[in-house]
């Protein structure tokens, strides 16, 4: 079952563990959206944080060309991917479960942006119950240098050096022109993920985890987003791990990271249940 075009992995909860943690309530379905170039074995480590809590997890990472080329050049290819991922919830008959997102870097955040837009506007998806989101090492705004570092890391040492520099130069010119120089014009038909999520944010609780040592995503961009959302009256919290590199928070601080994610999920579930109870009274 599911969409053959998507390279995703789903792990269903174990009944005994779910019952222990959620005591008769439907267990959360956690959607993990990987950073550009992340492999499923990387995401599986994060997935286990939630599987151990009796959650069902759905893991997906958008292809590199979609993140770095299509999105940078204004093609909304990720929007159709977002639609397919949300449809999977219906394919696997978990559309009535609480939904929780765990999003990594700009690669995951760009895809998350379209999922949020669909949850706002699409008749079918608007009935889904999203309880919260964890954002790891994102979002970054118009950071060409950071994007180049991310692309260089993703290409890796196997790519010919001359080809690597050519691709980096081409990417830099395209992004600089379309997303910075011409952005006052291009934003009218393709707003960047940062501005889109600042202007039309997700209404549910959010937690931003980041590091001021991150050389790909500027920590000030994350803090600006957090402050902007808090000023809109949203439930948003954040934590600066200070020393880890980009998307290395869990690797460097596994216990602290896991505890924060689990505690936040429990808090989101409790908050969601309280809101539902108030609606029924």
From Swiss-Prot:
Cellular component annotations (GO), alphabetically ordered: nuclear membrane; nuclear outer membrane
Main location: nucleus
Biological processes per GO annotation: negative regulation of BMP signaling pathway; negative regulation of ossification; negative regulation of osteoblast differentiation; regulation of nucleocytoplasmic transport
Localization annotation: Nucleus outer membrane
Signal sequence extent: none
Record keywords, A-Z: Developmental protein, Membrane, Nucleus, Transmembrane, Transmembrane helix
InterPro entries registered for this protein in UniProt: AB_hydrolase_fold, DUF829_TMEM53
A family per Pfam: DUF829
Bilayer disposition of the protein: Single-pass membrane protein
Segments traversing the membrane: 165-185
Function of the molecule: Ensures normal bone formation, through the negative regulation of bone morphogenetic protein (BMP) signaling in osteoblast lineage cells by blocking cytoplasm-nucleus translocation of phosphorylated SMAD proteins.
Family: Belongs to the TMEM53 family.
Name of the protein in its database record: Transmembrane protein 53
Gene: tmem53
């Amino acid at each position: 079952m599911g969409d053959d075009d998507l390279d995703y992995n789903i792990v269903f909860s174990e009944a005994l563990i779910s019952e222990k943690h959620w005591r008769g309530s439907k267990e959360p379905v956690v959607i993990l959206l990987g950073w550009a170039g992340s492999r499923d074995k990387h995401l599986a480590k994060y997935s286990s944080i939630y599987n151990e809590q009796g959650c069902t997890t759905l893991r997906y990472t958008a292809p590199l060309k979609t993140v770095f080329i299509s999105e940078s050049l204004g093609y909304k290819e990720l929007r159709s991917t977002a639609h397919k991922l949300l449809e999977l919830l219906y394919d696997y008959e978990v559309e009535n479960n609480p939904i929780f997102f765990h999003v990594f870097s700009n690669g995951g955040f760009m895809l998350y942006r379209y999922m949020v837009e669909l949850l706002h506007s699409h008749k079918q998806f608007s009935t889904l119950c999203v309880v919260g989101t964890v954002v790891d090492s994102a979002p970054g705004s118009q950071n060409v240098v950071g994007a180049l570092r991310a692309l260089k890391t993703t290409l890796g040492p196997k790519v010919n050096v001359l080809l690597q520099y050519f691709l980096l130069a081409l990417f830099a010119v395209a992004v600089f022109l379309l997303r910075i120089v011409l952005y006052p014009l291009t934003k009218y038909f393709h707003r960047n993920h940062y501005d889109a999520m600042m202007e039309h944010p997700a209404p549910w609780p959010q937690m931003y985890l980041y590091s001021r040592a991150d050389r790909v995503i500027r920590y000030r961009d994350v803090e600006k987003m957090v402050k902007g959302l808090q000023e809109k009256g949203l439930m948003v919290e954040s934590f600066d791990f200070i020393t880890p590199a980009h998307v290395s928070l869990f690797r460097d601080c596994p216990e602290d990271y896991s505890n924060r994610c689990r505690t936040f999920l429990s808090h989101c579930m409790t908050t969601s249940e309280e809101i539902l109870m108030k609606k029924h009274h």
